[in-house]
């Protein structure tokens, strides 16, 4: 074994980069090629640029700060050109990487644990007048008013331990700030960016079904699809069932949308006809006590479905399951997991830069949102396979500290060796020292992906 191999073997056992380890496990190079991330005649390898963006997010560094403090950073124009490139398939990159991660955690599932796909949307405030895809009047549940914002419809995966981001679309309504024809980039109609831009005017339900179909076609597996009352329409649920995905949802109490067979056609009428004859069970959610019962009902479009009527004393909530074998108690417990996504959005905003994109060009917004979700998935996976799982916030801070400390320490070590090599007597006595320094420096950069100034 040569000197180079001896040094690399010794360092590999000590110098561990959790980010690169995950990327290697999911075969990120293959995923990049499948998603059309190939190096052009001029420029840097896409893998290296994506790795730098991941480090910026994990280490909580602005792009300008990362460029200033990292010896191996590229110029700012390289990063800007990269996120505006129309040929890259960002959607395929996110779906394939999340599917690969989900395959890695598949052996960790226990019998009886449900794997869930969850469709939800989030509103990210955007004040700028020229941000492509943003709208003037988007209702924010957080601020309880209409605001200037991006409306992001997302498909998420959740189980009893983790959540992952699988896909997303930007939805533009009639209050759009810019028409699609006014977007900055003039794109070829066959480019990936053009195809993605064209979907922006589709309905939420259409976007959701398309995301679900893509995920299933790319190997994402789940037991149930969870949606809120916005998506809970008979035609939507029927299409999800046709894709082989049972649906659990809260229903809107709307007699125009939901009309049942038989004597009692509305949800209120069905509830009134059954409430005195059915055994009621009790439960507690926080400080709220409730009673519920379930019933199998016939629907004109969906056939036999199970409804769960939950009464808190003030409000009547109705849940649907197209799987009629599942118990009412389990339907309620499963639907509660939909709210885990709210914590996921919070982590994305606070830790992974979602909503903080400083771009107005549509292609760049898609790229930065994808990178935020991709980095979230990596950190969530690292947390899942640890023997002592933490909150994502705790793990995020640990990784931030670990990566930066490791990079600075190795840089200092190399500087010390370099100073030693400059002593004439040492060089005479040990001709291999300069080679050792070169090998350590190159291997450290390869394993970390960057070097920090001390």
Language model region names:
Residues 33-103, 112, 154, 158-164, ...:
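Short, positively charged, Gly/Tyr-enriched micro-motifs
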Residues 52, 66-69, 113-127, 155, ...:
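Short, conserved catalytic/metal-binding motifs centered on acidic residues
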Residues 59, 77-81, 142-220, 304-318:
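Electropositive, glycine- and tryptophan-enriched low-complexity nucleic-acid-binding patches
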Residues 85-175, 289-293:
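Active-site-proximal, Lys/Arg-enriched surface segment
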Residues 127-130, 233-240, 256-262:
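A short acidic (Asp/Glu
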Residues 1-44, 172-188, 194-204, 209-213, ...:
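A short, flexible helix-boundary coil/loop motif
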